[in-house]
Regions:
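Glycine-rich phosphate/diphosphate-binding loops that line cofactor/substrate pockets in enzymes
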Residues: 22-38, 56-61, 89
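N-terminal amphipathic/basic leader segments beginning at the initiator methionine
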Residues: 1-31
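N-terminal small/polar loop signature for handling phosphorylated ligands or for N-terminal nucleophile
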Residues: 46-119, 232-240
């Protein structure tokens, strides 16, 4: 009989709950040396004030940071390179991603490059990096991809016009945060789309060949919660229940 080994990889710390972003400084202060963070996000989240909610926390704690807000949906190699240039130029030693899958994916790419060097194209595939990436705080703002807790990221090679998929435990977040106060007020269409994305991921997890009793329990509960809450959340984006 073939031995079947299950490996579970997760962020070192995960916070879920209202105002959990207030805990970011205490986790950053646990890191070695003086923290200089690169905040990776997109201009839309800057304009609606979501990023300011997080950077206000950093300001009050006296944490030094720089912001890269050039992330676009389906982020490209060029975007990763620009973020990496700013990370290096400002002498950063950790990353705070604010957003959904795209900013978090860029943060993962920069994390791997900062620790391992080379080009992001070198890491396409499974477990291609030799060293753990620099610490990432992944602040999620949508309910869709789950990128804040996974070891996968996708970057578009705009030259070859292909999406590169990376699977690498070395890019896992140091701290993942799901703070619902950052998600209130989203347009109903975005709430619906990301909610259906979450439901799809849960169904996929339950029906895939690599499912385990552990993942089944999480998937079934996710399906139940989305089914109960999605219509309410779409009708009232400020409904915390």
């Amino acid at each position: 009989m073939e031995n079947h080994v299950v490996e579970l990889v997760q962020p070192r710390h995960t916070l879920i709950g209202e105002n959990s972003i207030l805990e970011i400084p205490q986790f950053l202060h646990r890191l070695e040396g003086t923290v200089t963070a690169l905040v990776v996000t997109d201009q839309g989240l800057v304009k609606i004030g979501t990023v300011k909610k997080v950077t206000d926390v950093l300001d009050r704690a006296g944490i030094r940071y720089w912001t890269y807000d050039g992330v676009q949906p389906n982020p490209s190699v060029g975007v990763v390179n620009k973020a990496m240039e700013q990370y290096t130029r400002q002498g950063c030693n950790c990353i705070i991603a604010i957003g959904g899958g795209s900013p978090i994916d860029v943060a993962k790419a920069v994390s791997i490059l900062a620790a391992n060097g080379g080009r992001i194209e070198d890491y396409c595939g499974v477990r291609k990096s030799a060293r753990p990436g620099v610490p990432i705080v992944a602040v999620n703002t949508t309910a869709g991809t789950g990128s804040e807790v996974t070891c996968a990221y996708v970057i578009t090679d705009e030259v070859k016009n292909v999406k590169m998929v990376m699977m690498d435990p070395n890019c896992l977040a140091y701290l993942a945060i799901n703070d619902p106060t950052l998600m209130v007020g989203m347009p109903p269409s975005l709430t619906a789309a990301t909610g259906m994305d979450a439901l799809t991921h849960a169904v996929e997890a339950y029906t895939c060949r690599e499912a385990t009793p552990y993942t089944d329990a999480l998937a079934i509960e996710a399906i139940r919660l989305v089914g109960r809450a999605l219509r309410r959340a779409g009708a009232d984006g400020c409904d915390m229940q």
